[in-house]
Amino acid sequence: FYILEYGKLFDELIEVVKEKIANGVEVFMLIDEIGTLNRLPKNFLTDMKNIGVKCQKFQGLTSGLLHNNRDHRKIAVVDGDVAFLGGVNLADEYVGKKQKYGIWKDGGVRIEGEVARDFAKSFCAMFSLSSKNIRCPKIDEDKCEKIVGDGLAKSLFFTPSCVGEKTKAECEIIGLIDEAKTEIKISTPYFIPDDDIQEALQRACDRGVRVKIFVPGIADKKLVNLVTKSYYQCQLERGIEIFEFEKGFIHSKNILIDDSSILVGTINIDYRSFFRNFECGVIVKNSRASRQLADDFSELEKSCKKIEPKDLPKTRLLIKILRFFAPIL
């Protein structure tokens, strides 16, 4: 997990973990040291060790790695057969037990079977990278693309790369956008698209696809929110519709294509997710999950304000300044 903080959610989780450890279950935990900075006590790793959790911090401040590359993934895998992933971290605001920014809108997906093992393998690889002394159990190699339930699922894992290069994350998202025939819906807490994403959205609009972007109405990071708003005008001019969630903060990272194909994961539409972070996601096509996400977007739109030209920022100089800093936020 990228963020972990003591609170009601973690207390409930750790009680279950203690019970499972007592029954002989091995528990491994990997947290990002930057994401958890100032959220956990210094003796957290010792506390976890004392209850039997094998816990490591990813790319700590004392490591020789460039700590600006963060492990932004949120994954929980059970027995290598069930995986949970999405936007939810292990902190109370993510499940509505603490309201810092109004209503917290988040989401994720549960997957079972062979695709879940891909996430188990990914976790073990990152855990081994962070720990010289502890190794995860070996996971059998499997193909990435599998039948899950009533649809087709594909696991996605993204690593940092150089700004200016088209990344795997971008290629997957652009591929979905280019497949769209009728409608694209995207929810993201931060909308700071680079040229490749903007060009893909432009192509979609040019062929008559309706594009809707859902972003927070209440910001958790004011500067990043201002940068997001700086992209409103050019998107509206393309014919893209932008909706702000008036009741609070959208943290879900979902893409829905033609009410059929979905991408759910940890990937924001911004430079950090595309170029700086380790991220993950899953593409699911023609499944019950697609229909559930379509219903969720419909409900979300009812709680949103549609952005009109009169709502756009007026200061062009401010927009230019904010855009300059977009790649490093």
Where in this protein do the model-derived segments appear?
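Charged, low-complexity intrinsically disordered terminal segments
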Residues: 1-329
